Amino acid sequence: MPNIKSAIKRTKTNNERRAHNATIKSAMRTAIKQVEASVANNEADKAKTALSEAAKRIDKAVKTGLVHKNAAARYKSRLAKQVNGLSA
């Protein structure tokens, strides 16, 4: 437990940010799973709308620094490939 006032404040801030980051990452993962579930059920329309939502969540995670931009591009590319495979 920190004794210095600034260290106490930093600990509080870190805990708040950790909780906030966890919610953003969780929402991103949920959106990705929704796309994958739609693809597994061969629901092309649902998969396309879920893909746009997932891309939005992934981009927000990049903007806040939770996910590296290259990793985000990889996630979006793999999801898009799965969705495009349905219509082919």
UniProtKB/Swiss-Prot annotation:
Q: Which InterPro entries match?
A: Ribosomal_bS20 (IPR002583), Ribosomal_bS20_sf (IPR036510)
Q: Where is this region: Disordered?
A: 1-20
Q: Which GO terms describe its molecular function?
A: small ribosomal subunit rRNA binding; structural constituent of ribosome
UniProt keywords (A-Z) are: Ribonucleoprotein, Ribosomal protein, RNA-binding, rRNA-binding
Record keywords: RNA-binding included? Answer: yes
**Which Gene3D superfamilies does this entry report, sorted A to Z?**
Ribosomal protein S20
Question: What is one process in the GO biological process aspect for this record?
Answer: translation
Disulphide bridges? none
Gene Ontology cellular-component terms listed: cytosol; small ribosomal subunit
The protein's matches in SUPFAM superfamilies, at most eight in alphabetical order, are given as:
Ribosomal protein S20
Q: Which family does it belong to?
A: Belongs to the bacterial ribosomal protein bS20 family.
PANTHER family (UniProt xref) = 30S RIBOSOMAL PROTEIN S20, SMALL RIBOSOMAL SUBUNIT PROTEIN BS20C
The free-text function statement in the UniProt record for this protein reads: Binds directly to 16S ribosomal RNA.
Query: Protein name, please?
Result: Small ribosomal subunit protein bS20
